[in-house]
Amino acid sequence: MTNTQQPLGTGFTAASTAADVLAGIDLSGRDVVVTAGHVGLGLETTRALSAAGASVVVGARSPARAAAALAGIERVEAYPLDLMDPSSIEAFAARYLDSGRALHVLVNNAGIMGGELVRDARGYESQFATNHLGHFQLTLGLLPALRAAGGARVVSVSSWGHHLSDIRWDDPHFDSGDYDGMIGYGQSKTANVLFAVELDRRWAEDGIRGYALHPGGIVTTNLAPWLTEEDWRTMGLVDDTGQPVIDPARDMKTPQQGASTTAFAASSPLLADIGGVYLQDNDIAPLEPFTEPVRQDIAAGPLETTVGVMPYAVDQEAAQRLWALSEKLTA
């Protein structure tokens, strides 16, 4: 496997904010879509890209709630989007294409994490359906607009959580039982990276580049509402008063810091001729020196992450295999 995971030495750090990486970058005239761009990291991403001049369409299950959250941000609107509902995804893509706009940046940001087993109407495990398959269908639906941009980027917000599981090729939907929500999350985050790898291989000649990234650990996003404050404290992510611990060097970030790598992937000229890579802390992350998934027990103590991507998440053959599986599952 050719190792494309070579850090660039960008000059940015884990403490850099979205405003830092966008300084001096003018996104005027650029059209962007951000899924769940009205909450958590998505909201910070929308705010930062808009401040740089971009026009943003936010995909949200409740456009009214999204509009309230987005009040005061310029050049932004919300379309209804439910990533577990194929008809909703199709309608979103059709509405965007009907607008006649090109699409310069697609940020596949929405995600869910852990919890009990939930299935969509097709019987698919909800995290794989939402975090990967929904975005896969959406991206393919928006392909004409991406091509029309004459140079576009598809940014998939993955996670260090991809270290928790490779793709469960024989049972991606846990039909055999023994469900583990964090394994399901890890699988979906690995899928995000593999999707970026194969998308870039397929579409780079059309000027469409793919990126995946780990934003960092951000407690305030409400990504996992099933976790209690005690769980967060055990993982070392909140202090004794319940306040988030902010320590970028240990991957504990503010929302503004967490949105920085998304903004970097969406806009940095340093990535102009690079794609199909996994980013972390506003740079290309190195390959991890180990190959087996990490076992994490929330109750075992402070969560420790590393700077790097698992080899199985950037394997080109696996990426092609996942694309074929995804086409089958979304047909």
Question: PLM features: what roles do these ranges have?
Answer:
Residues 1-80, 86, 90-91, 95, ...:
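NAD(P)H-dependent oxidoreductase Rossmann-fold/reductase module
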Residues 33, 104-107, 128, 155:
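N-terminal Rossmann-like NAD(P) cofactor-binding module of classical short-chain dehydrogenase/reductase
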Residues 36, 110, 131:
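Glycine-rich, N-terminal phosphate-binding loop of Rossmann-like dinucleotide-binding domains
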Residues 109-115:
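Conserved NAD(P)H cofactor-binding loop of Rossmann-fold oxidoreductase domains
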Residues 116-130, 177-179:
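Short alpha-helical oligomerization interface
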Residues 117, 128-139, 155, 188:
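Short alpha-helix in the Rossmann-fold core of NAD(P)-dependent oxidoreductases
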Residues 130-150, 166, 200-201:
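Amphipathic alpha-helical dimer-interface segment in Rossmann-like NAD(P)H-dependent oxidoreductases
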